[in-house]
């Protein structure tokens, strides 16, 4: 086990593993507990009352964090002609067709979002085994297969994130850098939780949002009182 720093030891007693905190209190505590020498991310883990092995209990979608993510998201776009030019003008990092496919098959996958126009899906379809496991496969339900590539690129660069429930019913996401301050982090928290609540599937049974915890990239988890969450 790694040795605790003096600051970590001093803060260790501040976290009661069983205590439920209000959202504002939890965000403040996470920021106080951050000890890394870099600008850590506020991370959320939500335990949902769903079993994603059943199609009618899948939770997946996109949400725009009003204060952004604090990250530079690299975006690749499959498009030709006028759409390719629009994607580049909107800030896409890489735009192409067969050439982009070959580049990705060669292992160049350093992207946070992959977007495609509908007519390019014949090419993109060949990348299913390459992009699928990384969660990068363009999907019309997520707005990443679209004729409006410029809007999709701007959304990806402007704080839009994708979410998807994992096998055990948990959703993880980053809600921005701790340096954003408590007010902006709260705005991002509210937007994310609201999106998850609205994405409640028809097959969900019993209590939907069961547990919520916040932490910094390297810090301990702080439990949030779900009674404070609207619609949860």
From Swiss-Prot:
Classification via CDD domains: Ribosomal_L1
UniProt keyword Metal-binding present: no
NCBIfam families the UniProt entry points to: rplA_bact
The protein's name in its UniProt record: Large ribosomal subunit protein uL1
Family the UniProt entry places it in: Belongs to the universal ribosomal protein uL1 family.
One Pfam family named in its UniProt record: Ribosomal_L1
GO biological-process terms attached to the record: regulation of translation; translation
Gene this chain is encoded by: rplA
Alphabetically ordered keywords of this record: Repressor, Ribonucleoprotein, Ribosomal protein, RNA-binding, rRNA-binding, Translation regulation, tRNA-binding
Assembly description: Part of the 50S ribosomal subunit.
């Amino acid at each position: 086990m790694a040795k605790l720093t003096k600051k970590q030891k001093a803060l260790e007693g501040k976290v009661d593993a069983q205590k439920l905190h209000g959202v504002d209190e939890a965000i403040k505590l996470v920021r106080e507990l951050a000890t890394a020498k870099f600008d850590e991310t506020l991370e959320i883990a939500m335990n949902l009352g769903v079993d994603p092995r059943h199609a009618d209990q899948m939770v997946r979608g996109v949400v725009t964090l009003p204060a952004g993510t604090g990250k530079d998201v690299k975006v690749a776009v499959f498009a030709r002609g006028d759409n390719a030019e629009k994607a580049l003008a909107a800030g896409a990092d890489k735009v192409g067709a067969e050439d982009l496919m070959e580049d990705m098959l060669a292992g160049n996958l350093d992207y946070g979002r992959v977007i495609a126009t509908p007519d390019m899906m014949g090419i993109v379809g060949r990348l299913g085994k390459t992009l699928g496991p990384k969660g990068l496969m363009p999907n019309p339900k997520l707005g990443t297969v679209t004729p409006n590539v410029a809007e999709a690129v701007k959304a990806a660069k402007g704080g839009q994130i994708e979410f998807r429930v994992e096998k055990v019913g948990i959703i993880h996401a980053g809600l921005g850098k701790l340096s954003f301050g408590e007010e902006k982090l709260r705005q991002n928290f509210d937007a994310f939780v609201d999106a998850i609540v609205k994405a409640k599937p028809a097959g969900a049974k019993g209590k939907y949002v069961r547990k919520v915890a916040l932490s910094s990239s390297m810090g301990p988890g702080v439990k949030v009182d779900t009674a404070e969450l609207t619609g949860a």
